[in-house]
């Protein structure tokens, strides 16, 4: 019986890192998603998108929340 390697869907290790670098790491580790850097507090759509990872950053572009698919 063959086992499948699960696709990575969240990146808790990136909290506290630079958002632009985090977005690059996410797209390298999961080529099926587009990582989008978003300043914390800006309005966002509430739709669920399995091809998107939002990387929330503060005013210093530091990741403030766990990036995850959605």
Swiss-Prot record:
Modification after translation, per record: Occurs in 3 forms that differ in the modification of Cys-5, HPI-1 forms a homodimer through a disulfide bond, HPI-2a is modified by glutathionylation, and HPI-2b is covalently modified by addition of an unidentified adduct but not by a disulfide linkage.
Residues that bear N-acetylalanine: 2
Pfam families for this protein: potato_inhibit
Annotated InterPro entries: Prot_inh_pot1, Prot_inh_pot1_sf
Residues modified to S-glutathionyl cysteine: 5
Membrane-traversing stretches: none
GO molecular function, one term: serine-type endopeptidase inhibitor activity
Keyword presence, Acetylation: yes
Site (Reactive bond): 46-47
GO biological process, one term: response to wounding
Keyword hit for Disulfide bond: yes
SUPFAM superfamilies: CI-2 family of serine protease inhibitors
Keyword annotations: Acetylation, Disulfide bond, Glutathionylation, Protease inhibitor, Serine protease inhibitor
Self-association and partners: Monomer and homodimer; disulfide-linked.
Family label: Belongs to the protease inhibitor I13 (potato type I serine protease inhibitor) family.
PANTHER family: INHIBITOR OF TRYPSIN AND HAGEMAN FACTOR-LIKE (PTHR33091:SF73), PROTEIN, PUTATIVE, EXPRESSED-RELATED (PTHR33091)
Record function comment: Inhibitor of serine proteases, strongly inhibits subtilisin A and weakly inhibits trypsin. Does not inhibit chymotrypsin, papain, pepsin, pronase E, protease type XIII and thermolysin. HPI-1 inhibits subtilisin A with an Ki of 0.21 nM. HPI-2a inhibits subtilisin A with an Ki of 0.08 nM. HPI-2b inhibits subtilisin A with an Ki of 0.1 nM.
Name the record gives this protein: Protease inhibitor HPI
């Amino acid at each position: 019986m063959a086992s499948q390697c699960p696709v990575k869907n969240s990146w808790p290790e990136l909290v506290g890192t630079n958002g632009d670098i985090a977005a690059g790491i996410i797209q390298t580790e999961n080529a099926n998603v587009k990582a989008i850097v978003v300043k914390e507090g800006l309005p966002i759509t509430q739709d669920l998108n399995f091809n998107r990872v939002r990387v929330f950053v503060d005013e210093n572009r530091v990741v403030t929340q766990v990036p995850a698919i959605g």
